[in-house]
């Protein structure tokens, strides 16, 4: 890992302005198979709303089919903001298997610093389901030129995007039930995991919730 010391990288809050959204499209080999028509309709509505305002990156094993579905519902202007990549997946939870983005500005704010995409190991919430294809999506998208950013390999540490929240000021919120669950980062202790999260996410402190799920 080689972060320029003059640049303060941090994990932005959920409400921070964003340039785009990533979706992993449902298909017949996901758990959505019995409800594929209904869930595809939901994703088409998502794509319609997102593309009114910002870019949309879609990973799908059926690019042409997905494109035709979108073209029937979206305007040409909306379609110009959609980027399709032919990539297979186990499931659709891009929030969890997608890259975690760090942002930064130069000290004098004279220029924009490239974003850093953190590619963690994803193992379907502790090896509960198939995950090998989902775990490969970020690298495939990166090498296909989908991201206007550099990528950092954190595949030696298991973490999904839905396991953490940030206030954008250096505080990360997580839960003990998630981070200490089996088949994740054992044999690391809680203290060691805390240190790993701070270092990898450039955080000042980690707040652990002892109950509930995040």
Regions found by a protein language model. Give the residues of each.
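The feature marks the mature, well-folded catalytic cores of soluble enzymes
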Residues: 1-214
């Amino acid at each position: 890992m080689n972060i320029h010391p003059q640049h303060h990288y941090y994990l932005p809050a959920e409400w921070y302005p964003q340039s785009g959204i990533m979706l992993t499209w449902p298909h017949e080999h996901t758990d959505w198979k019995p409800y594929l028509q209904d869930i595809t309709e939901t994703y088409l509505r998502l794509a319609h709303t997102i593309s009114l305002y910002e870019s949309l990156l879609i990973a799908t094993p059926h690019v042409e089919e997905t494109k035709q579905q979108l073209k029937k519902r979206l305007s040409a202007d909306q379609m110009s903001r959609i980027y399709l990549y032919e990539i297979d997946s186990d499931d659709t939870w891009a929030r969890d298997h997608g890259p975690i983005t760090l942002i930064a500005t130069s000290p004098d704010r004279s220029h924009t610093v490239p974003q850093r995409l953190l590619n963690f190991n994803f193992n379907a919430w502790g090896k509960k389901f198939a995950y090998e294809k989902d775990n490969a999506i970020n690298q495939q998208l990166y090498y296909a030129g989908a991201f206007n950013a550099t990528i950092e390999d954190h595949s030696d540490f298991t973490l999904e995007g839905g396991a953490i929240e940030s206030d954008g000021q250096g505080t990360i919120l997580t839960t003990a039930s998630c981070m200490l669950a089996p088949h994740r980062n054992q044999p690391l202790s809680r203290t060691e995991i805390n240190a790993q999260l701070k270092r990898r996410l450039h955080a000042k402190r980690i707040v652990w919730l002892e109950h509930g799920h995040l």
